[in-house]
Design a protein with these regions (language model features):
Chain B
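Thiamine diphosphate
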Residues: 1-174, 178-179, 184, 316-317, ...
Length: 318, 336
C-alpha cells in the first residue's frame, strides 16, 4: 500500500466506527458497542501484510481487524445494526462477527481469541500452507492464561501465529502497569522462543513495517511473533461507559497528540506527498461513502422472529 | 428500622451489604476486575476501596482462573473472599476452580475444610447477545456443592448477599444486569431497604403476590416482569400467585408445592435455558411432592435452548419478558 492508501484506510476505519456510533442513541444497536476510534493505525497497518487464506481472530473491539481481513463492509455494518441482511443474519451482533470466506472470527470473551488463532496456525502448518494466523488481544487480554498457553504451544511447535497486542494501557479502568509483571508485553516473547517487538501504534507507517516483519517471521516457519502496538482508546470502554478513570484534560490531550489520522496527515503534508486540499477531499469522500452505506443499511429489515431457532444445528431447527 | 424508601439502585444495596459485612468481619474482602478504583462496572463495590484499602478491595488483571483459584486458597486460609466475575458469561474461563475446587473441596475433605467464598456475578439479558446475556444459574445448580442465589428485589439483594457472605458454604450470587442500575422506588416488590445490617436465610422462597388461579414460580428480574403484568391478567380474570424462588440451591419447592396445591396450575418462568435446568427440576419436585394427579396443568417458559441472538426482534422471541410471560400465563389458564 502507498502512504496515501494507508491514510485512506484509516479514514475508512474511523468513519465506519463513527457510523456505528449513530446506532446507539437510536437503539438500532441495542447492546454494547466497543469502538476502535483512536486505534486506526493498527488495523490499517496490518492490512497490507495479510494474504488470501490468512486468518484473523479478534476481540470485543474487532471492527478494524475485520475490515483489515477483508470482511465486506456492508454486511458487517448490517450485522452490527442487527439486520437480517447482516454477515451473521442478525444472530451474532457487533461482538460476534464471523466470515468463513475471509477466515475472520472474534470473541467477546477476553483471552478467547488466541486459542482459535492457534487452531488456524496449526492447520496451515499441517497442510503446508504459507498462511499465518493473527490472534488479536488487548493489553488486558495478555494477562489471561490463554496467552501463555497459546504462545507456549506455538513456540514449541513453531506455528505461524502472530499475536497482535493492542496496548491502549487500559483494561476498562485497570492500567496495565498495575497488573503486568513485565514492563512490556512484547518482552515476554523470550519465554516462548518468539519474535517480539513493541512499536508506536499511532503511526501507521511504523505499524505497517513492524507487522510486515512479524508476518515474515511467522510465515518463514520460525514460530510465533508478538507485535505490541501502543495506542489510545479515545472513547469509553463501551458506549455508555462514564470513563471516569481518566480526567477531561488527559482525554483532551490524548486526542490532540495521539490521533493516528492527524499524525499521518502531518507527515504526508510535511513530506510533500499530498496537499491539504487533496487530503480534505479524501476525507469528505470517505465520509460521504460511509453515510450512503449507513443509509442503505438502516433501510434493511430486522430478522423475522419466526426464525429465532434456526441455525443451531446443520439442516434443522433443533 | 427506618421506614422511608431510600431510592438506592440495586448496585448501591449490594455495595451497602458488602460494606456492612466488611465492617463486621475483617476477613471479608473483594477481588475482581474494576471493583476497586471505579467501584465496579455497575457500581456494586463503589466507595469500598476508599473505605477499606486496596488490599481488601483489589483490582485484578483479567486473569479469572488465577483470582478465582486465589479465592479458594484465601478461603482455606481463613478469609472470606468475594470474587467478582464481571458477567456470569465469563465463568467459562475459570469454571475449573469453581466446580472442581470451590464446590468440591468441602465434601472431598470429609467436611474438614470449609470454603466460605462468594462468587458475585451479573447474569441475565442486557441485549448483548450470545456471550454476554446468559443466566447460567442452572449450570451452577447442576454441579454439586454450591449454593446459588439470584435475588429480585432491593431488599433481597442486600439481605441475601449478607447471608451469602456469612455462609460457611461456597455461594454463587447472581445479580441481574438489567436490574443493577434500577432504583428501589421503581420496584413493585421489596423496594424498602433498611439501613442496618440484616441477612435473609438462603433457601426460603417468598410469595410476592397471593392469588388463587395459577402459581407462577420464578426468580431474579422475571419476578418484576410477572408482577408488572399481574394486574392486567387479574382484570382478564386470572388471579396469579407469584413465588419468588430467591435461591436455586437450596430450591424451596415446598413453598411452590404448597401454592400449587391451592391453585392447581404451575407455570415456571426461567430466563435461563429451558432444558435440563431449573424449570424441569422444579416441576419434577412439585410432582414428586403432590403426586402426578396433584396438579391440573403445568408449563414452562424459558429460553428455548438457543444462544441469545443479537437482533432485538430475535431476542424478544426467545428471552422471557413481560409480554411473553403474560402470554404464557394466558395459554396455561386457557387449558382446562
Ligand atoms: C473472560 C472475560 N473477562 C472479562 C471480560 C469483560 N471485559 C471485556 S473487555 C475488558 C477489558 C479488555 O481490556 P483489553 O484486553 O486491554 O482490551 P481493550 O478493551 O482495551 O481493547 C473486560 C474486562 C470479558 N469480556 N471476558
Amino acid at each position: 500500500m502507498t502512504r496515501l492508501e494507508r491514510f485512506r484506510a484509516m479514514l475508512t476505519l474511523r468513519h465506519f466506527d463513527e457510523a456505528c456510533l449513530e446506532g446507539v442513541p437510536t437503539g438500532e444497536i441495542h447492546g454494547e458497542l466497543h469502538t476502535g476510534i483512536g486505534q486506526e493505525a493498527i488495523g490499517a497497518g496490518m492490512m497490507e501484510s495479510l494474504q488470501p487464506g490468512d486468518a484473523v481472530v479478534s476481540t470485543h473491539r474487532n471492527h478494524y481487524h475485520a475490515l483489515a481481513a477483508g470482511v465486506p463492509m456492508k454486511p458487517m455494518l448490517a450485522e452490527i445494526f442487527e439486520k437480517a441482511s447482516g454477515l451473521c443474519r442478525g444472530r451474532g451482533g457487533h461482538m460476534h462477527l464471523f466470515d468463513a470466506e475471509h477466515n475472520f472470527s472474534c470473541s467477546g470473551i477476553v483471552g478467547a481469541s488466541l486459542p482459535v488463532a492457534l487452531g488456524y496456525a496449526y492447520s496451515f502448518s499441517m497442510k503446508g500452507q504459507n498462511n499465518l494466523a493473527v490472534g488479536v488481544t488487548g493489553d488486558g487480554g495478555a494477562n489471561n492464561g490463554a496467552f501463555h498457553e497459546c504462545l507456549n504451544i506455538a513456540g514449541a511447535w513453531k506455528l505461524p501465529l502472530v499475536v497482535l497486542v493492542e496496548n491502549n494501557e487500559l483494561a476498562i479502568s485497570v492500567p496495565i502497569g498495575d497488573v503486568s509483571a513485565t514492563a512490556t508485553i512484547a518482552e515476554r516473547a523470550c519465554a516462548y522462543g518468539a519474535w517480539g517487538k513493541k512499536v508506536d501504534g499511532t503511526d501507521v507507517d511504523i505499524v505497517a513495517e513492524a507487522f510486515a516483519e512479524a508476518a515474515h517471521h511467522a510465515r518463514s516457519g520460525r514460530g510465533p511473533a508478538i507485535l505490541e502496538a501502543s495506542c489510545h482508546r479515545f472513547r469509553g470502554h463501551f458506549e455508555g461507559d462514564h470513563d471516569s478513570y481518566r480526567t477531561m484534560k488527559e482525554k483532551r490531550e490524548m486526542r490532540e497528540r495521539h490521533d493516528p489520522i492527524t499524525i499521518a496527515r502531518r507527515k504526508l503534508l510535511a513530506e510533500g506527498l499530498a496537499g491539504e486540499a487533496e487530503l480534505d477531499a479524501m476525507a469528505e469522500a470517505s465520509q460521504r461513502e460511509m453515510a450512503e452505506l449507513l443509509a442503505e443499511v438502516r433501510a434493511e429489515p430486522l430478522p423475522e422472529a419466526a426464525g429465532a431457532l434456526d441455525y443451531l444445528f446443520v439442516g434443522g431447527k433443533r | 428500622m427506618s421506614s422511608a424508601v431510600r431510592n438506592l439502585s440495586i448496585s448501591q444495596t449490594v455495595a451497602e451489604a458488602i460494606g456492612l459485612e466488611m465492617e463486621r468481619d475483617e476477613n471479608v474482602m473483594v477481588m475482581g476486575e474494576d471493583v476497586g478504583k471505579i467501584g465496579g462496572v455497575f457500581g456494586a463495590t463503589r466507595t469500598l476501596q476508599k473505605r477499606f484499602g486496596d488490599k481488601r478491595v483489589r483490582d485484578t488483571p483479567i486473569s479469572e482462573m488465577a483470582f478465582t483459584g486465589m479465592g479458594v486458597g484465601l478461603a482455606m486460609a481463613g478469609l472470606r473472599p468475594i470474587v467478582e466475575i464481571m458477567f456470569v458469561d465469563f465463568i467459562g474461563v475459570c469454571l475449573e476452580q469453581v466446580y472442581n475446587a470451590m464446590a468440591k473441596i468441602p465434601y472431598m475433605s470429609g467436611g474438614n475444610v470449609r470454603v466460605p467464598m462468594v462468587i458475585k456475578t451479573a447474569g441475565g439479558c442486557i441485549g448483548s447477545a450470545a456471550q454476554h446475556s446468559q443466566c447460567l444459574w442452572g449450570l451452577f445448580a447442576h454441579l454439586p456443592g454450591m449454593k446459588v442465589v439470584a435475588p429480585s428485589s432491593p431488599f433481597d439483594h442486600k439481605g441475601l448477599l449478607s447471608a451469602a457472605i456469612r455462609s460457611d458454604d461456597p455461594v454463587v450470587y447472581i445479580e441481574h444486569k438489567a436490574l443493577l442500575l434500577k432504583k428501589a422506588e421503581t420496584f413493585l416488590n421489596g423496594g424498602h431497604v433498611p439501613e442496618e445490617r440484616y441477612a435473609i436465610p438462603l433457601g426460603k422462597a417468598k410469595v410476592v403476590r397471593e392469588g388463587s388461579d395459577l402459581t407462577l414460580a420464578t426468580l431474579s428480574a422475571s419476578v418484576e416482569y410477572a408482577l408488572e403484568v399481574s394486574e392486567d391478567l387479574a382484570r382478564e380474570g386470572i388471579d396469579l400467585e407469584i413465588v419468588d424462588l430467591r435461591t436455586v440451591v437450596p430450591l424451596d419447592s415446598e413453598t411452590v408445592a404448597a401454592s400449587v396445591s391451592k391453585t392447581g396450575r404451575l407455570l415456571v418462568v426461567d430466563e435461563d435455558y429451558l432444558s435440563f435446568g431449573l424449570s424441569g427440576e422444579l416441576v419434577t419436585r412439585v410432582i414428586e411432592a403432590l403426586g402426578p394427579g396433584g396438579l391440573k396443568q403445568v408449563a414452562r417458559h424459558a429460553v428455548p435452548d438457543v444462544p441469545i441472538p443479537a437482533a432485538l426482534s430475535l431476542e424478544e422471541a426467545v428471552v422471557p419478558g413481560p409480554a411473553s410471560i403474560a402470554q404464557a400465563v394466558r395459554e396455561l389458564a386457557a387449558v382446562s
